[in-house]
Amino acid sequence: MRTYSPKPGDIQREWLVIDATDVVLGRLAVQTANLLRGKHKAIFAPHVDTGDFVIIVNAEKVALSGDKATTKMAYRHSGYPGGLTATPIGEILEKDARKAIEKAVWGMLPKNKLGRQMLKKLKVYSGPNHPHQAQKATPFEIKQISQ
């Protein structure tokens, strides 16, 4: 018997909406990356994009555990000598929480063409509203552990 390999026509994509209110950033990123990759499906294959579309609302209400708001840094480099810039995650969350969530999810996806294609299926919004009502997104609940 031959191993099944999913074809692009076999993949049924869903739209899922996640409310990020009081959800720890890392747990949110792990669940979102798994949904974008399609690891929750029986037809998952690492070389095929089998994932779903994910909408994250209330991005500004995401939580950080411990004192990560001040100690965890996001690094950028300009390409010039001495061009390394370190910014605390808490500062990025205050400025634009959508960027912080996208950066956390991108860190958990493959760094290739397939990963970039998966990241395009992620839609992050700061408020409770999103412009994807026509897709009839089903709510996805992230199981929380008390902090």
UniProtKB/Swiss-Prot annotation:
It comes from the Bacteria. GO terms for cellular component: cytosolic large ribosomal subunit. Keywords: Ribonucleoprotein, Ribosomal protein. GO terms for biological process: negative regulation of translation; translation. GO terms for molecular function: mRNA binding; structural constituent of ribosome. The keyword Zinc does not apply. The keyword Cell inner membrane does not apply. Part of the 50S ribosomal subunit. HAMAP family: Ribosomal_uL13. This protein is one of the early assembly proteins of the 50S ribosomal subunit, although it is not seen to bind rRNA by itself. It is important during the early stages of 50S assembly. NCBIfam families: rplM_bact. Belongs to the universal ribosomal protein uL13 family. This is Large ribosomal subunit protein uL13.
